[in-house]
Amino acid sequence: WEIAQESIRENKYLRAEKALLTILRVDEKNATAYNRLGILYAKQRAYKDAIECFEIAQSLEPSASSLHNVGLIYYETENYEKASLAFEQALEMEDDLAARYIAYAKVQEKIGNTKKVINALEKAVELEPIPQTLKILAEAYDNAGQTELAEELRKKATKMLTPTTSSKKADAPRPRQQRKIHQPRKIVM
């Protein structure tokens, strides 16, 4: 297992593939190994093999992450309907990751479902109200003709990135108060 992980990190794909296939010969129901193999194939743009691995992993051990991975592959291969379905299923299983909603929104944008794009991105902002997510939602609002909302979000994102003057004062080092130096006490024995 360590060989497979190390090889993937070092981009030694052939070695990683051999290690993972060896694991699967011994334990053919190892969903994690199928997931890793799918990631490996996706990195090499062998999308058909990647999808097959993720689907096997999903059938062995249903998980939101393997569905998300399948969704990403379908998105990459421009099969947006299947990508949408995969992301929807992943969100049904685990709906607390902003990245999942952002990926789903990107697919909906390709399909032309503006309302679903905005709903997904609003949920992403709710989960992770950081400047990057706010800017993505602002762009979606612009595309939907809601420029006032977009501008409001951009201002909010900029505010988050720019420290205010009151927080600058709070962060500024305070001068040390001068302490009176006392003579040490005399010890009487």
Give the residues covered by each predicted segment:
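Alpha-helical segment of the N-proximal tetratricopeptide repeat
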Residues: 1-32, 36-39, 43
